[in-house]
A protein has these predicted regions:
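A short, compositionally biased micro-patch
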Residues: 11, 34, 161-163
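RNA pseudouridine synthases
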Residues: 34-60
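Catalytic-pocket segment enriched in acidic/His residues
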Residues: 51, 59-173
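Acidic active-site catalytic centers that drive phospho-/nucleotidyl reactions
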Residues: 7, 34-36, 55, 104, ...
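Single conserved hydrophobic/aromatic residue that forms the stacking wall/gate
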Residues: 1-12
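Short connector loops at helix/strand junctions that flank enzyme active sites
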Residues: 5, 32-36, 46-47, 79, ...
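Short acidic (Asp/Glu) patches
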Residues: 16-35, 66-69
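Conserved double-stranded beta-helix
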Residues: 13-14, 80
Length: 173
C-alpha cells in the first residue's frame, strides 16, 4: 500500500529491555509486532547509538481509532509496549543493512534499512517539531512490511545487521 509521507503517527512508549518478556496486554485480542531500528539521543541532542526494537501494537484498538479519526495512543502506548535490545554506540548501521523479525523461527518481516519511508534523521527532525527531545530518549524509526499477530507463548527474534539482536517471549496475562 502507499504511505502518505505528509502524515506521521508518533507516540510515547514504555520500553522493555532485552531479556525481559512482555506480558500480553489487556484490552486487545490482536497484538502485532513491528521490528524497528531505534536511535538513542545523547547529551548534545544528536543520535549517539542504535538498538533493535519491537513496536507492539494493539491492532484492533488502532483500527477502531483510525475509523473514528482518533489518535492511536491507546493502541501504541501501553505497559511493556516497546521491547528494546542492547544499545550500540556509534554511527548509523549500513543503510543497506538487513532488518528482520521471526516468530517461533518463522520469518515474518524482512527488509533493508534503506527501504524505509523516512530515514532516521528525518524521523528525529519530525520528533523535534513535536516534543522537546532529551538525552536518553529512544526513538523508534519505522518498520518494514510484514507486521503480524502475536499470541502468548510466541518467541520473537528481531535483528538489524551490525547490532545486538532482541529476543523475547510474549507472556500470558
Amino acid at each position: 500500500h502507499r504511505v502518505d509521507r505528509r502524515q506521521r503517527q508518533m507516540c510515547i512508549r514504555d520500553r522493555v529491555t532485552d531479556g525481559a518478556h512482555p506480558i500480553y496486554p489487556t484490552a486487545t485480542g490482536n497484538l502485532h509486532h513491528e521490528v524497528e531500528l531505534v536511535c538513542a539521543i545523547g547529551e548534545d541532542g544528536d543520535i549517539i547509538g542504535w538498538a533493535v526494537g519491537c513496536d507492539l501494537t494493539r491492532r484492533d484498538l488502532q483500527a477502531a481509532a483510525k475509523d473514528k479519526g482518533r489518535p492511536w495512543d491507546a493502541a501504541k502506548g501501553f505497559d511493556q509496549s516497546a521491547p528494546c535490545g542492547a544499545l550500540t554506540l556509534g554511527a548509523l548501521p549500513d543503510p543497506a543493512a538487513a532488518i528482520a523479525l521471526t516468530v517461533n523461527g518463522q520469518t515474518r518481516q524482512s527488509g533493508r534499512l534503506d527501504d524505509m519511508v523516512w530515514s532516521p534523521v528525518e524521523v528525529l527532525e519530525k520528533a523535534r517539531t513535536l516534543w522537546d527531545v532529551q538525552p536518553g530518549d529512544l526513538i523508534f524509526t519505522g518498520t518494514p512490511e510484514g507486521v503480524g499477530p502475536l499470541v502468548p507463548g510466541d518467541r520473537v527474534e528481531a535483528m538489524v545487521a551490525g547490532l545486538s539482536p532482541l529476543s523475547f517471549t510474549v507472556r500470558p496475562r
